[in-house]
């Protein structure tokens, strides 16, 4: 029998009978239980639906700590089925960005190879990951109001994909609470107003950290002015509609939060309404203020009841 050449052997190994039937290393299944592992920065990606889009206010302090001490605890990572890269599971995108910076600056291996805790991708993976990041970000530096609002809008999207139906604000609040991120329904309503009516006009102001109370004031002002506009514009021909007017006025005040004055917004908006509606400024302002007061009375959260005083027990004679 003639001796096989290396080329003949390679041809036989590539024949049908010798085709690989097992899974490749790239497609082996992930662990089915929490498992410590070491991964490299090349294998990790930030969570793509992270609600935080602005720089963590504690970024410099966190970076200094990691440079000196490393990570305090292994970050939790996971992986979507069929994907090549791991992602941060709960929070941690800031720490991942810092590790990349430190690796680029120092080339120290401890910033490139990271001890992590792998946690399997759960059945409700997207919503579990998102609510986990929302909760973790609240604990580590907090989120701006608009970041929370956009995160909750994304959560609504995931819940509606999961259930196949639209959710009311109260049902959204119930589901968020059940998944470990409680948000009052009244806050969800304000967040919806911020995303729908305020964000297109004042993104710099909102991402700069405009808080809930200022957002409340703008939302109440918008609604009060809209009601007054609808009543006074009825049967009239007006050059613009209220939605356009509100956006045009508000855009002028897209500045940093420290320079923002809601009263200036109100003065400008009422002034332009008075001109377009051919109405007296002071009369219009009184109508709007009255409407604002009634709206606040209807939407304000009830005060917590004052606990009853303990009965006074007379001292023994």
Region annotations inferred by a language model:
Residues 171-174, 187-190, 264, 268:
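Amphipathic alpha-helical interaction segments
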Residues 100-104, 108-171:
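Amphipathic, charge-rich alpha-helical segments that serve as recognition/docking helices
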Residues 226-233, 237-317:
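Long, charge-rich C-terminal accessory regions
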Residues 149, 153, 169, 178-235:
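Amphipathic alpha-helical "recognition" segments
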Residues 159-177, 185, 237, 241:
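Short, charged amphipathic recognition helices of the HTH superfamily
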Residues 2-114:
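Short, charged/polar connector segments at secondary-structure boundaries
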Residues 53-61, 93-94, 129, 143, ...:
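Charged, alpha-helix-enriched surfaces in structured cytosolic catalytic cores
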């Amino acid at each position: 029998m003639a001796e096989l050449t290396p080329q003949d052997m390679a041809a036989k190994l590539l024949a049908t009978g010798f085709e690989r039937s097992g899974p490749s290393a790239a497609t082996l299944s992930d662990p089915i239980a929490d498992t410590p592992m070491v991964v490299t920065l090349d294998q990790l990606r930030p969570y793509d639906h992270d609600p935080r889009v602005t720089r963590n206010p504690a970024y410099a302090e966190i970076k200094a700590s990691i440079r000196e001490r490393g990570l305090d605890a292994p970050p939790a990572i996971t992986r979507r089925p069929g994907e090549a890269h791991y992602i941060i599971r709960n929070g941690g995108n800031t720490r991942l960005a810092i590790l990349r910076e430190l690796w680029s600056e120092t080339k120290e291996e401890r910033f490139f190879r990271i001890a992590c805790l792998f946690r399997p991708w759960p059945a409700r993976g997207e919503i579990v990951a998102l609510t986990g990041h929302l909760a973790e970000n609240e604990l580590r530096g907090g989120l701006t109001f608009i970041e929370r609002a956009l995160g909750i809008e994304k959560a609504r999207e995931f819940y509606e994909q999961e259930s196949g139906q639209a959710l009311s604000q109260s049902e959204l609040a119930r589901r968020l609470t059940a998944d470990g991120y409680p948000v009052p329904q009244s806050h969800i309503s304000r967040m919806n107003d911020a995303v729908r009516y305020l964000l297109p006009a004042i993104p710099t102001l909102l991402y700069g950290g405009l808080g809930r109370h200022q957002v409340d004031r703008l939302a109440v002002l918008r609604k009060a002015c809209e009601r007054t506009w609808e009543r006074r514009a009825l049967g009239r021909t007006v050059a613009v509609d209220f939605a356009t007017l509100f956006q045009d006025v508000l855009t002028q005040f897209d500045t940093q939060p420290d320079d923002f004055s809601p009263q200036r917004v109100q003065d400008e908006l009422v002034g332009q309404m008075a001109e377009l509606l051919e109405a007296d400024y002071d009369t219009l302002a009184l109508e709007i203020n009255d409407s604002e007061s009634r709206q606040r009375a209807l939407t304000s959260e009830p005060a917590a009841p004052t606990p009853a005083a303990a009965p006074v027990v007379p001292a023994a004679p």
